[in-house]
Amino acid sequence: AETHAKYGTTSMVPTTLTCSDTELMNMFATYRKAKVLNTKGAKFIGLHLEGPYFSPKQSGAQDPIYLKKPQPEEYNAILESSEDIIRWSVAPELEGAIKMGHVLQEHHILPSIAHTDAIYEEVTQAYKAGYTHITHLYSAMSSVTRRNAFRYAGVVEAAYLIDDMTVEIIADGIHLPKPLLQFVYKFKGADKIALCTDAMRGAGMPDGESILGSLANGQKVIIEDGVAKMPDRSAFAGSVATTNR
């Protein structure tokens, strides 16, 4: 938090990855302690949970071992374990995701769309259930797809066609090239766009190996070229950008 504050960040939302229940509970406890100890850094304003309810087809840097469908008894137990959650990213096409969206709304938590292979019709249904925001537009999500010879609009197209849908983009200049950033701005407008760093622990650190997720069971990544990459360099694994970038 102190490192990010040096680069202009005033508030931040610590974010989880898909992980075991034990690690998630440990994260909740760590966050509660950090809120008290953090007096000089960027202010913690709540937690963002990414997963584990994501599509295996769009797992990205998320550990596929932990991916699953939403089960009420499970996510309700998580909600009872922390009052700090302000946003939860989910793949809305999964069985049980629509019901979960309604539950999150009841808890005043923003349901968000991420790591998803949904088609347009599934996104519009999810929007009505409270999924009014898209996490990391273009990253690990469907665009125009073909199923049995027929083409279907995906999440990206739905983001533009649903006027009041807000979108978040990783604005590090690497995840999305400049023309694509301009495209998003042109068609959504500044009031429907949130810029984020998506910074992982490698932010402010020198190039080399790092860990995405927990130190005990997280995924090894490589920091180079101003971004975190999977070890085989086949995909990005988060950003190391700071707000000034």
Regions found by a protein language model. Give the residues of each.
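Generic structural signal for well-ordered alpha-helices
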Residues: A1, M25-R32, Y75, G101, ...
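Divalent metal-dependent hydrolysis catalytic cores, especially in the metallo-beta-lactamase
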Residues: A1-M27, A42-S55, S82-E93, I109-S112, ...
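Active-site glycine- and acidic-residue-rich loops that bind
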Residues: S20-N26, E93-E95, H108-Y120, I170-F183, ...
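Short acidic, glycine/serine/threonine-rich loops at helix termini
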Residues: L24-M27, K57-Q62, M100-G101, R146-A149, ...
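Surface-exposed amphipathic alpha-helices with a cationic face
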Residues: R32-K35, G101-H108, Y185
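Short helix-capping segments at alpha-helix termini
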Residues: V36-A42, S81, E106-H107, K188-G189
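Divalent metal-binding pocket/active-site signature
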Residues: L49, P56-P72, A77-A153
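His/Asp/Glu-enriched, well-ordered alpha-helical/loop segment
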Residues: R151-I169, G173, Y185-R245
